[in-house]
Swiss-Prot record:
GO biological process, one term: isoleucine biosynthetic process
UniProt EC number: 2.6.1.42
InterPro entries registered for this protein in UniProt: Aminotrans_IV (IPR001544), Aminotrans_IV_CS (IPR018300), Aminotransferase-like (IPR036038), B_amino_transII (IPR005786), BCAT-like_C (IPR043132), BCAT-like_N (IPR043131), BCAT_family (IPR033939)
N6-(pyridoxal phosphate)lysine found at: 204
Origin superkingdom: Bacteria
Names of required cofactors: pyridoxal 5'-phosphate
Stated name of the protein: Probable branched-chain-amino-acid aminotransferase
Length: 368
């Protein structure tokens, strides 16, 4: 197979799963539990650039124990989904935005940038051999694509590596939360922070997620599904949820207003977030990006001014938030039921991604 940037070699798996095994997995995929038969690998060496692009059987990789990624976490990743349309084509939602964000993340972690064209080609190459893993038309299922770059050079000196590897793996997925579109309960972390100004919060960097795990454990211990992060300086402004951006709906009907935390440099610029802002404008809603105080959230929810809250991201898609906990405080949003604005935006975005609504912004890209 030939890319416009590099030529890909293809080595097919000698032991792919059977059709029956695959269908059994696709019937109940979970999230990230199973992987397709193949993966993409591309190497980088300083002075030579990206090279040796190949599709190979999915399996363990060999890594030196002193590889810089294992000691200094020089790694970035992305996440996007592939969908099967009724006409048989396989498409993805705004992969160009994921390619651009991977480059932005790489710059922040001193990793060489993977060209957008090569990123998109890698998706197409994997879909070409593993297209049978893309779930059936309709439903909540999709094929989750996980591209990532990590430092492979051995050495214990603290410096950017000179050798890297790009891998692309894929996993069939269902709903991110067990309850599907049922509203979730969130825990506001008052003790821990995810990121700080000037840090790595705007990069899709594994270290940010590692830093969130203790708070996520705390959330689970308090009967919550996810963590809400506050800013690192004043510890009062809502930033995002674990791996997701957050939206607040004030008012209802055609006069509803959507508010989401502004991109401060310490939260992730989500592709779904940006898309929902545009879709809200298309639907005639006013939108605002600004700081949102946790006290404002509580008071306006109690007064009935905040009528809906939802989280959004590639993995969790659009998930309503019904209940909020922190310390001895607990409150609900509008009785805890999913809101009309939330569900309308969810239906619109779902329709675009599944090919049943008009893609007026040209967001869908064919992969196979």
């Amino acid at each position: 197979m030939t890319s416009g940037f590099l030529e890909f070699t293809v080595s097919l798996s000698a032991h792919p799963v059977t059709d029956a095994e695959r269908e059994s997995i696709l019937a109940e995929p979970g999230f990230g539990k199973y992987h397709t038969d193949h993966m993409v690998s591309i190497d980088y060496i300083d002075g030579r650039g990206w090279h040796d692009a190949r599709v190979i059987p999915y399996g363990p990789i060999q890594l030196d124990p002193s590889a810089i990624v294992l000691h200094y976490a020089q790694e970035v990743f992305e996440g996007l989904k592939a969908y099967r349309w009724a006409d048989g084509s396989i498409v993805s939602f705004r992969p160009d935005a994921n390619a651009a964000r991977l480059r932005s993340s790489a710059r922040r972690i001193a990793i060489p940038e993977l060209p957008d064209e090569l990123f998109i080609d890698s998706l197409c190459q994997l879909i070409a051999v593993d297209n049978a893993w893309v779930p059936r038309v309709g439903g909540e299922e999709a094929l989750y694509l996980r591209p990532f770059i990590f430092a492979t050079e051995p050495g214990l000196g603290v410096r950017p590596a000179k050798q890297y590897r790009y891998l692309l793996i894929a996993s069939p997925v269902g709903a991110y939360f067990k309850g599907g579109i049922n509203p979730v309960t969130v825990w506001v972390s008052m003790e821990y922070v995810r990121a700080s100004p000037g840090g790595t919060g705007a990069a899709k960097f594994g270290g940010n997620y590692a830093a969130s795990l203790l708070a996520q454990t705390e959330a689970a211990a308090n009967g919550c599904d996810q963590v809400v992060w506050l800013d690192a300086v004043e510890r009062r402004f809502v930033e995002e949820m674990g791996g997701m951006n957050i939206f607040f709906v004030l008012g209802s009907g055609g006069s509803a207003r959507l508010v989401t935390p502004e991109l401060s440099g310490s939260l992730l610029p989500g592709v779904t977030r940006a898309s929902l802002l545009q879709l809200a404008i298309d639907a005639g809603f006013s939108v605002e990006e600004r700081k949102i105080d946790i006290d404002e959230w509580q008071k306006k929810a109690a007064a009935g001014e905040i009528t809906e809250v939802f989280a959004c991201g590639t993995a969790a898609f659009i998930t309503p938030v019904s209940r909020v906990k922190y310390g001895d405080t607990e409150f609900t949003i509008a009785g805890g039921a999913p809101g009309e604005v939330t569900m309308a935006l969810r239906d619109t975005l779902t329709g675009i991604q599944r090919g049943t609504f008009a893609d007026t912004h040209g967001w869908m890209a064919r992969l196979g």
